[in-house]
A protein has these predicted regions:
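Catalytic machinery of carbohydrate-active enzymes
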Residues: 1-313
């Protein structure tokens, strides 16, 4: 019998990789043994109790593993079989995306993600109490304007609330090449840690924060392994397909703030049909599928400020 290996070579995103951990955990209990992993992000699995051997895709080829392992490919976006049954990520819960590719689903109580950080390393001048923000750029539909992040920070500071910013510049290759630079700006009361933290330091900062503010992002899913207050800013993908599960539910210490537009166009199959004449098609998700001049699904600064005050008072 070949040893089981969770094959994530097609899974490129940080958040998508974190969302494989519920499937990994279920495989552990099914096989009754630790599961090896092939991944672009080995640091995600470094301290995971369910993992046997971690293979880095930059160092190990799939072909070299085929003889000794059963390769369980869990993340195969839109790859169809003879019955044209592919998976469409914008229409699916991102945790189920991994599980469904292997032929099963996860129950709500099984959907929590796993990440075990290294020990906390103190950060110089870190405030005792702070709101943590994640001001980075992604697809336009998932980017809150940089000026809004600055204004939110200023409003919090003016009310005596320290702010710490985290995030890393990156890029993503999918249907488009998307550059994801950070919004890097000084903070009067607090600390700018953009492009400075490890994944473990980031986890601890989220855990220690009064609240963590982010769009739909990789760090949203990392936050799902903490006990922090999470504020997710609205975007065009239905929040129920992305919001973290903790204690078997999605509303535990979780707050979704949307704007006036609540149709979640990126998760509506009608737009795929409109673009491709088939529900199998994925419309261009980077923009507004209603062709509005601005993203009305995004919240205002005052909405976010008021929610933070409500949480931390």
């Amino acid at each position: 019998m070949k040893e089981p290996l969770l094959d994530l070579h097609l899974c490129k995103g940080l958040g998508d990789t974190i969302c494989s951990t519920p499937t990994l955990r279920k495989l552990f209990f099914a096989y009754g043994k630790k599961i090896s992993v092939l991944t672009d992000h080995p640091y995600i699995f470094k301290n995971n109790q369910y993992v046997d051997i971690i293979f880095d895709t930059s160092e190990t080829s799939r072909e070299s593993l085929e003889e000794g392992y059963e390769l369980l490919v869990s993340f195969a976006p839109n790859i169809e079989n003879q019955y044209k049954l592919g998976l469409i990520h914008n229409l699916m819960d991102i945790r189920q995306f991994h599980a469904s590719g292997l032929g099963f689903n996860l129950l709500p109580e099984e959907c929590g993600v796993d990440f075990t950080p290294d020990e906390w390393e103190p950060i110089q001048n870190l405030p005792d109490k702070f709101v943590l923000i994640h001001p980075v750029q992604s697809w336009a539909s998932r980017t809150w304007d940089g000026e809004k992040w600055k204004l939110l920070t200023r409003m919090l500071n003016d009310n005596g609330i320290a702010v710490v910013s985290i995030g890393k510049s990156s890029s993503e290759i999918g249907f488009h090449m998307v550059q994801k630079p950070v919004f890097d700006f000084p903070i009067k009361l607090g600390l700018n840690l953009m492009n400075q933290t490890t994944i473990s330091q980031t986890w601890w900062l989220i855990q220690k924060s009064l609240s963590f503010v982010t769009m739909d992002s990789g760090l949203l899913h990392l936050a799902g392994s903490t006990d922090s207050q999470i504020i997710q800013l609205g975007s065009s993908i239905n929040w129920r397909l992305r919001a973290p599960f903790r204690n078997g539910v999605q509303d535990y210490k979780y707050h979704y703030i949307d704007g006036d537009c609540k149709i979640a166009c990126a998760s509506d199959m009608r737009y795929g049909v409109r673009e491709w004449n088939s529900i199998r098609g994925i419309p261009p998700l980077v923009g507004c599928l209603e062709n509005k001049k601005e993203f009305l699904c995004h919240p205002s600064v005052s909405q976010v400020f008021n929610k933070i005050n409500e949480i931390i008072k």
